Amino acid sequence: MALPLSDPNAPEFTRRYVNLADPRLGAQALEASDDFFAPKERMLNPEPAVFIPGKYDDHGKWMDGWETRRKRTTGYDWCVVKLARPGVIKGVDIDTSHFTGNFPPAASIEAAHVPDGAPNEATKWVEIVPATTLQGNSHHYVEARDANAYTHLRVNLYPDGGIARLRVYGQPQLDWAGASRSALFDLAAMENGGYVVAANNQHFGLASNVLLPGRGVNMGDGWETRRRREPGNDWAIVALAQPGVIRKVEIDTAHFKGNYPDRCSIQAAYVQGGTDSSLVTQAMFWPVLLGEQKLQMDKQHAFEAELAALGPVTHVRLNIIPDGGVSRLRVWGTLDK
């Protein structure tokens, strides 16, 4: 099944930053004032929301999101979300897909920094998204302008209703300054701040999946391109979380058996200046970090001695030759001094 097209109107922060509310990275919906019609956890599902006509449960129409009962008192509904990592929030997407007569007229988002435990009555909340008018069956992209790092959010619905998905895009905050300069870090890991700048094709699976933690759960939990019918090869460019010297690379083709790439190679560079989009052309000429290597189906491949000594780099380009699917990419390196 081909992937649905991404929203062409989505702002840059949805592509540039990590979804800190992704449960695959560790985010959790902790508590809610009410989730009678649809559980709060469903709001964080990384898959796009769906609508299933005729599907009902004991509480009524099944909806793919978080939905509260009709409020017959004063006040408003809320849900507390623990982010996957502490981070500086750059923007959110409050998605009401398929909620038409049951979406909230407005919503706001507050944030708190609670490094130990969960928020309580003494927690100080800071509004990062003011009360925003919502429409049914729509994405609502709101930029956040707070430079502080937060660990938890409180989503407020005025007064009640349902939202399909909550995406919270931000920069994970790690103590890189205090980190060891001799330890190995997965500099491409999404939870560390690595992200996919661009990929030439993502027909069957998003390139960003290769940066997720753990091994892929199935073939859909990886990056897969369409069958190439012309010369050339497919590729994805990854911005590393921090500049570093690459010591080891792992390429995992888990679950890809009749559709894994025949070969792969990696280029890398230390990029200063320019924009993400300007890297696409430049990356063709980057130095080779890993020359062409044969791949096997459903296997973790590790490369160390094969890596060229390029010094510190900020970006890598994974080439899969000619096409196919990769489950995970790990780029282990030491931090640039």
Swiss-Prot record:
GO biological process, one term: purine nucleobase metabolic process
Pathway per the UniProt entry: Nitrogen metabolism; (S)-allantoin degradation; (S)-ureidoglycolate from allantoate (aminidohydrolase route): step 1/1
Record keyword Hydrolase present: yes
Gene that specifies this protein: alc1
Pfam families: Allantoicase
Family to which the UniProt record says this protein belongs: Belongs to the allantoicase family.
Top-tier EC class: hydrolase
MF GO annotations: allantoicase activity
Taxonomic superkingdom: Bacteria
This protein's UniProt keywords: Hydrolase, Purine metabolism
PANTHER family: ALLANTOICASE, INACTIVE ALLANTOICASE-RELATED
Catalytic activity, EC: 3.5.3.4
Identification of the protein by name: Probable allantoicase 1
Reaction(s) this enzyme catalyzes, per UniProt: allantoate + H2O = (S)-ureidoglycolate + urea
